[in-house]
């Protein structure tokens, strides 16, 4: 059963040898065909009040080009800007809709061979860890469904049960994924060199270079080129 965690916290291992190994999986585009915008769109369309639904839906649609541009330029800036859209939504409502989000949006979008990839990692003796820029509560049902051991994800700040639109640091994105993976391995006695990483995006390049066994999955054009130049395995699970 999955045991999603919010963020890793580094701890001293007293110089003990790191003997374990893990498989770190990006989610959006790697295991599923949806992304964080789809998840928010679902919440916006099921907010509860008709005026709220209309306002948030129209705002989301109008900003899609901006979301795309920010995501292309800087994933960290995109995350900070995008998650402001959650401001004002209630924690209770978001959590109530989580299972519906999974059944209606996420589960149908799981790539056909994604589960096989995770099962293969488990047979190899790896601890399965999902690493995503998505909000933790949106991906918990997926982590459970896939049988992941842990999940490293972004966390929304709530004050008085209301979302502030701010993500609690550290923000899980592109280059910073390498840092949180490094911390996670240190905390859990896992060897980076024995571990695997899987992603579809060149923005996660650092995540691949921090482990000894990187794999490009459904890679974008730039990541495919990088994978070929470094002789990394290239997989298609779609």
Language-model features, listed with the residues they occupy:
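C-terminal cap/substrate-recognition subdomain and adjoining C-terminal extension
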Residues: 2-14, 18-20, 96, 103-238
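Active-site neighborhood of HAD-like aspartate-dependent phosphohydrolases
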Residues: 4-70
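Phenylalanine-focused residue identity feature
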Residues: 24-25, 43, 67, 72, ...
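A metal-dependent, Asp-based hydrolase signature
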Residues: 34-37, 49-119
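Intrinsically disordered, low-complexity N-terminal regions enriched in serine/proline/glycine
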Residues: 39-41, 85, 183, 229
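Acidic/polar active-site rim loop that often engages polyanionic ligands
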Residues: 40, 77-79, 161-166
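Generic secondary-structure boundary signal with a strong preference for alpha-helix termini
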Residues: 41, 83-86, 173, 177
């Amino acid at each position: 059963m999955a045991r999603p965690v919010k963020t890793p916290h580094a701890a001293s291992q007293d110089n003990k040898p790191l003997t374990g190994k893990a498989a770190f999986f990006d989610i959006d585009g790697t295991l599923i065909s949806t992304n964080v915008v789809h998840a928010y769109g679902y919440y916006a369309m099921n907010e509860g009040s008709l005026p709220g639904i209309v306002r948030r839906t129209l705002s989301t649609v109008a900003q899609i080009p901006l979301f795309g541009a920010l995501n292309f330029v800087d994933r960290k800036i995109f995350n900070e800007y995008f998650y402001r859209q959650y401001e004002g939504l209630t924690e209770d409502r978001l959590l109530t809709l989580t299972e519906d989000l999974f059944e209606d949006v996420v589960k149908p979008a799981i790539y056909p061979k994604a589960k096989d990839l995770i099962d293969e990692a488990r047979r190899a003796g790896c601890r399965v860890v999902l690493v995503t820029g998505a909000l933790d509560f949106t991906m918990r049902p997926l982590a459970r469904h896939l049988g992941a051991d842990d999940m490293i994800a972004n966390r929304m700040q709530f004050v008085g049960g209301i979302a502030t639109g701010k993500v609690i640091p550290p923000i899980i994105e592109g280059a910073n994924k390498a840092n949180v993976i490094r911390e996670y391995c240190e905390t859990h006695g896992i060897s980076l060199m024995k571990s695997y990483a899987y992603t579809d995006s060149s923005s996660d390049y650092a995540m691949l270079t921090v482990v000894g066994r990187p794999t490009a999955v459904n890679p974008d054009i730039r990541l495919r080129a990088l994978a070929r130049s470094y002789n990394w395995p290239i997989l298609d699970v779609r």
